[in-house]
Design a protein with these regions (language model features):
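Residues in well-ordered beta-strands of folded domains
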Residues: 75, 95, 139
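Noncatalytic regulatory segments and standalone regulatory/sensor domains
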Residues: 122-156
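Low-complexity, intrinsically disordered Gly/Pro/Thr-rich segments
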Residues: 110-128
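Active-site-adjacent substructure of cysteine-protease-like catalytic cores
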Residues: 55-84
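Extended terminal accessory/targeting regions
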Residues: 28, 89, 96, 151-155
Length: 156
């Protein structure tokens, strides 16, 4: 299986009872089942998974500042395919990293990301079918807390 091919990974998860995702997925450490291509990814489900795995994460707003030693991230979803995070950088602009690709500070239209909620995140015109059409939330995540994961997503 090519772990860099999301469709192969999802096929493995959907069709095999004992197939473990080769990378951490939100909800694995807190006991949620693997994602299924038969069920849409929703904001409430994704947020529950994230907060279940990381109780120190806090919901926030675009205007609010995160506490010291935390970073602000934004969660967006493509309900049929994927979820995605963007991070607010020290210059107050936003950056994103898709899988093994380099970090970018522009959206799918090549525009600087000032606010993820207003950004164009439809990548279906590239070599992908991803369209992060639903904005879910802004979150403050700890920067200094280390999280150790076991194979299969469990916490050490």
């Amino acid at each position: 299986m090519n772990i860099n091919d999301p469709k192969q990974v999802q096929l493995c998860i959907d069709e095999s009872q004992d197939c473990e995702a080769p990378f951490h997925q939100p909800g694995s450490p807190s006991g949620y089942h693997h994602f299924s291509s038969k069920k849409l990814k929703t904001c409430p489900n994704m947020i529950a998974r994230i907060l279940g795995d990381n109780p120190d994460i806090r919901m926030t707003t675009f205007e609010s500042r995160c506490p010291v030693n935390t970073s602000k991230i934004a969660l967006v979803v493509d309900p049929k395919e994927d979820y995605h995070f963007l991070r607010q950088d020290s210059n107050m602009l936003w950056s994103q990293k898709a899988g093994a690709r380099p970090v970018k500070n522009v959206d799918a239209a090549g525009h600087t990301i000032w606010d993820p909620q207003l950004s164009y995140l439809n990548y279906s015109s590239e070599d992908s079918t991803l369209n992060y059409s639903i904005f879910c939330a802004y979150l403050c995540v700890p920067r200094i807390k280390k999280l150790y994961l076991l194979p299969g997503g469990g916490k050490a």
